[in-house]
Amino acid sequence: MSDINKIDMFKNDVRYRENIAHIETISAKKPSFKKIDNLNEDIISYLESKDVKLYKHQADTYEAIKNGENVIITTPTASGKTLAFNLPIMDTMIEDKNATALYIYPAKALSNDQLHVLENLENDLDIKITPRTYDGDTPRKDKKAIREKSRIVLTNPYQLHLILSWHHQWSKFYKNLRYIVIDESHYYKGVFGSNVAFLIKRLKRIANFYGSYPQFILSSATLANPRELANRLTGEDFYLVDEDTSPSGEKDFILYNPFHNYKRNKVNTQNAPSIHMETENIFMYLMLKNIQTLCFTVSRKTTELIAMWAKKDMTQVKGKLAHRIAAYRAGYQPQERREIENGLKSGKYLGVTCTNALELGINIGSLDAVIISGYPGTMISTWQQAGRAGRSNQKSLAILIAFENQLDQYFMNNPKFFFDKPHENAIIDLSNPILQEAHILCAAKELPLKRGEAEKYFSVSQNVLDRLVDNEDLNINHRGDFMYPYDDNPAMDHSLDQISSEEFKVMNNGNLLETMERSQVYREAHEGAILINKGDTYVVNSVNLSRGFVNVSKETVDYHTMVLNKTETNIKKKLSKTKFGDLTIHFGELTVSEDYFKYKKMHFSKPIGTYPLDLPPLKFNTKGLWFTIPKSVKDTLEDMFPNEEEVFAGGLHGAEHALIGLFPLHTMCDRFDIGGLSTNYHEDTQEATIFIYDGYEGGIGICEKAVDVFVELLNSTIDLLNNCSCKSGCPSCIYSPKCGNDNKPLHKNATKYILEYLSKMISNNNHGKKEEIIEEEIKNSNDDEFSDAYELYQKGDYSASKDVLNNILANDKKHAKALALMGKILYDQEQKDIALVFTKKALSADKSNELANELEVLLTSKSSMSSTFELNNLDDVDTLYEEAYDLYNQGDLSSSSEILEKLLDFDDKNSEALALMGLIYYHSGIFPKAIEYYKKASKINKNGEMVRELKMRVS
């Protein structure tokens, strides 16, 4: 039987055909070729020896690069992108014996794969380019030779981030740098992409310093905004090559919905089969038809499970095929991965389950079929994975198996959207202040930063530099240049994968299990949580928020945990408003407070217990969009559903969930990258309001892009609800897996009414008109909090008032009212020495503050304080320090740190105490904190005994 017939059999099999939501037959395509005039003779000979004719898009790429253009090429997988940019680079290498090129890949496996391609080109063209990879696995003994002799170096952003400050060792390479190649550039989005964009700007600055102005060559999967991405990533303008002229075989792309009959017949989907077991059934079916299949899954654990089940079942059915099944994922040894890759190419393996580790362009040859178990999060990933089948001209098969969530079910009901032109926008945000400051520090470490360079390379204003100087993070030298004044490398403190440098260590019996950010600790690793790592379950026993530790123990349990939280938002500043007909979408800066107050133990989907949490609120500043719903909508809904409670609130909540659920359709993000809040009444807007915000400190550009595509987002969301046949809401429409309110209240019909009301507002004329709002301060949330603190003070609740004041001062250290009130509380509590410290800080911030002036008179009068500064032994600074130092020497780091915290609360300029705290963090393995405390201590006194010892450790 031919492969075509075998593939067609699946579509008609009675076991599967009722769940097929759509079949898209993608026609075979013939190639289109183009000759290049004046092609280098060596390259002509090479192409003829390989019997290669250049496709038109390859020739177009070649010509654009040789004409000096920056080029981004966005043709599909297996269309010959690599050859398209390698040939002009080789041409330059032949012409200029000193020319160099830097290839940047997001993954080591890709670097190694492309290294072999370049080595073969070097041999076939008989030129000396000595291509080498330079990453964390490169032996130290080889690094010097690579820096001095290699003309093409392949690396990844993480390695480049760390070695840029050693650019003097690469001076010859940078002096002759002609090309920077960024492969798989669609990978650079969100936090990682924004960090890499700043990294590329640092790289450009160094190249310019050595006199080179390299061309950029980017390759990418198909995007809605390729030129915008390329420009954001590099700061350059680009020539786009997006016409695919390579041949391809016919492909059937099947959208497969295991929930199809359940939803059509309105049967509870809890009775539906396991998606993973359904995936394994289809995987087995194809292998038994001798169809070589690659099965993509959403997690490492699922990859292993499906391979294990398939091997077990195949042993029972056709034992000789069981050894031809394998799993492939990150975490395997390199030689294991190479063996599976080669086994796929040779046909040794008939079926392989994998994570997205095989999505990128690693060469595994041609396959007959691909199964995609669950939408992988982006259309780019989906088509990259589907492109693994049918690399030659034979017919192939791709099957997307839907999960029950909004995105997967939307595609099942809207195949035209799925197969239509690209909708996804890759987002890079260069306005995040935390990222700006982190990379400015790195740049100043690499080379003194001249006035004007911050704006030229990083689009950062002079105000940012002044703030860094005020904070003593930068110094100004005699030439007026900005310099990083410390011995450490700030790149070591800043991860490219996150915004915050704060890191928590998850420890199991003294061994490091993983690291995570504070927000992730609150969501996944709070006390009592079940943490899953590499398929094993761990119970969180304790969390130390001040020292950054999470202690867990490995236990086998039959439940998981789900945290609940209450969210509050305050509008800090409006930045713009966009009119869509009669609907106004606002965009601006928000302050978000998330209170994680309890968690539930869940056995599958059934709650088996609820437990309180005692965590301080998680507060952060971000950017988001919001819009209001008039009271008339509430009145109408209450008339429509007179006997139901919380109809309006349920509709707002459902609209928020549904919109967020489809954000990834239009902006390349994960739904967990964004948060939301809906409320019947918001103090800042005076109306019912829906907020949607970036879930990252400072914002990352997701909601800003969402404003531009809001009409498309709204229409998609309405389609989603209209095509979902459930009665009152389900995971396919308005339920959210991350809802902190336990998906309550929700009302599907009210949700539909609200969304359709918004659509009617938009249908009027003049939509899409954006107005910038210059520095409009809507509300200062600190002033509101101060009012709360003052009210608590008047009631005599000093402890609660101080908690609120501490929150204010964490955001604004110079909030004069908060400083003065803290001083007054301390004065009333007879802590007059510390009260004086806060009073002086308040007067420094605002000399006219009445309360601070009154306090100063009281605190400096002889009747209030004795002329000598007296403290009892417990509060005596020297005594406390000696006690902490003795405990440190005895190895009691925990007790020592507790005493130091008390001391530093009183005297935060004690350099020896700061350094001793840094040493405790160092010995605890929390190196970023150790470096942070060294910086604080060395700014005060570089020559202190403990400061010098800490410097020796952190250096």
Identify the role of each PLM range.
Residues K11-S49, A59-D60, K66-T82, L87-P157, ...:
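Helicase motor core with emphasis on the C-terminal RecA-like subdomain
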Residues K395-A398, E404-F418, H439-R451, R467, ...:
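Extended Lys/Arg-rich polyanion-binding regions
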Residues D783, K817, E850-L851, D878, ...:
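Start-of-helix register in tetratricopeptide repeats
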Residues Q794, D828-Q829, L858-K862, N889-Q890, ...:
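Register position in tetratricopeptide repeats
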Residues L821, L855, L916, L950-R953:
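Canonical tetratricopeptide repeat
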